[in-house]
């Protein structure tokens, strides 16, 4: 599954501070040896390329100019993918300044870019972490999100 590959890559190369300059062919071979399917590997790598490309788009400029009181209205397909709990979590993260409108839109874009029928709040948290890691200047937000993710996994968050 694509989400499993993304989490594997994030934990292996990003969270462990491993060498991020990995040859794509070597990476594909490693993922195949780890038991992932070629089709899913290509989808995951394409998803990551699209995440990197989001930083170069002009769409973020329009979002940055929106009024602070603006409210995000979700499209029907977004509502189908992001349940009420997930949408509430995104709103919560905006209120505590972990997400900006720009990073929220990047998260939603990448959530919609996943080819999966099953999507849960924990998956959303991983996507948020990946987006924050990939956008320069979000180190504090990344740290807060990482604490939210890992403290929940360890049963500390109340």
From Swiss-Prot:
- A Pfam family found in this protein is DUF494
Query: Do you know which InterPro entries this protein is assigned to?
Result: Smg
Matches recorded under HAMAP family: Smg (MF_00598)
Q: Which family does it belong to?
A: Belongs to the Smg family.
Protein's name according to its UniProt entry? Protein Smg homolog
List the lineage, top down: Bacteria, Pseudomonadati, Pseudomonadota, Gammaproteobacteria, Vibrionales
> Which gene specifies this protein's sequence?
smg
């Amino acid at each position: 599954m694509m989400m499993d590959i993304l989490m594997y890559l994030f934990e292996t190369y990003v969270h462990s501070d491993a060498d991020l300059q990995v040859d794509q062919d070597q990476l594909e071979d490693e993922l195949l040896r780890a038991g992932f399917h070629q089709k899913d590997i290509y989808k995951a790598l394409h998803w990551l390329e699209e995440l990197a490309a989001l930083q170069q788009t002009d769409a973020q400029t329009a979002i940055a100019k929106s009024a602070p009181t603006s409210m995000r209205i979700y499209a029907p397909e977004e509502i189908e993918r992001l349940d009420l709990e997930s949408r509430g979590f995104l709103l919560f993260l905006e209120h505590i300044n972990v997400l900006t409108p720009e990073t929220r839109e990047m998260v939603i874009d990448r959530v919609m870019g996943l080819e999966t029928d099953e999507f849960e709040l924990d998956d959303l948290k991983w996507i948020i972490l990946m987006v924050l890691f990939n956008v320069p200047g979000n180190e504090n937000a990344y740290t807060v999100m990482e604490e939210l993710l890992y403290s929940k996994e360890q049963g500390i968050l109340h």
